[in-house]
Amino acid sequence: MKRKILFITGSRAEYGLLRKLILASAIDNDIEMSLIITGSHLSTKHGLTYKDIEKDKIKPTQKININLHGDSPKDVINSMCIAMKRFSNAFLKFKPDLIVILGDRYEIFSAASAAMILNLPIAHIHGGEVTEGAFDEAIRHSITKISHLHFVATDEFRKRIIQLGENPKTVFNVGGLGVDAIGDLKLLSKAEVEKNMNFKFGKKNLLVTVHPETRVDKRKQYKNMKSLLAALKKHTEIKFIFTMPNADQHNEQIANLIKAFCLSNSSNSSFYSSLGQLTYLSCLKYIDGVLGNSSSG
């Protein structure tokens, strides 16, 4: 009898890490693999990144829209409530033997909470990590306490999960999935990257990704972003490649500032809602540095 394993992905970064595991599970004769796509994958302003999953010839079992129509704390809470209700319905329908989740997104926390109430086993990947300035860490540790199996990237993270009270026999240091994700990729040539991005590299190039600091006041985040852009404006000799901030509260003010900056500095600044994993990683090969607070770099 096949084991029914359900994967959940809600963002481009998360899918990039889960991708090889999902593909391997899809062809395993002992596994009946299901996939739920949610979160910013289904958001137009974040590039409808579910299309990248479909390019991998993976057909999602279900798409769960959680109404990402705003970025205020109230909007996030509303999305979390919708997510919990819709995930619970999906879990009752699929009856998985194991739910596999990764990271610290609030929609993943909603899914984990629904699974906990339904007494469904959860395997959590990339727990035990620390994030300053964001409530990601609180969500991540909360998911840890809800989960049954833990797959971490380092011994330090394993120790932290055990310190949280988890049974050492359920915590496994398997390394970071990002290494596996990058290792087998055939990166694009410089010309291919330029074609995909409709962009011409300059003598100096920086990739800029700034996500909201969810535990920092909205006005302070606005001021910090304005200061960063004012500093970048002085460097006309550098070409700046901006990517979309993730779908956390107050992401819209950051995105709007970036878009306005790129519009008024179009000769050396470009904005992309999503580059896709292959183009993004290939782009890193040809730039001089990464600027911002994203772990993707």
Q: What are these model-derived regions, one by one?
A:
Residues 4-9, 14-26, 66-168:
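Active-site and donor-binding regions of nucleotide-sugar-utilizing enzymes
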Residues 8-9, 41-47, 146-221:
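A nucleotide-sugar donor-handling region in carbohydrate enzymes
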Residues 10, 37-40, 127, 176, ...:
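Cofactor-binding loop segments of dinucleotide-utilizing enzymes, especially the Rossmann-like FAD-
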Residues 21-31, 231-235:
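A short, Lys/Arg-enriched amphipathic alpha-helix followed by its capping loop at the start of a domain
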Residues 31-76, 86:
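Conserved nucleotide-sugar phosphate-binding/catalytic loop shared by glycosyltransferases and other
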Residues 34-39, 150, 240-246:
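Short internal beta-strands
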Residues 53, 188-286:
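Donor-nucleotide binding loops and adjacent catalytic segments primarily
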Residues 101-102, 109, 124, 150, ...:
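A donor-sugar binding/catalytic signature common to diverse glycosyltransferases
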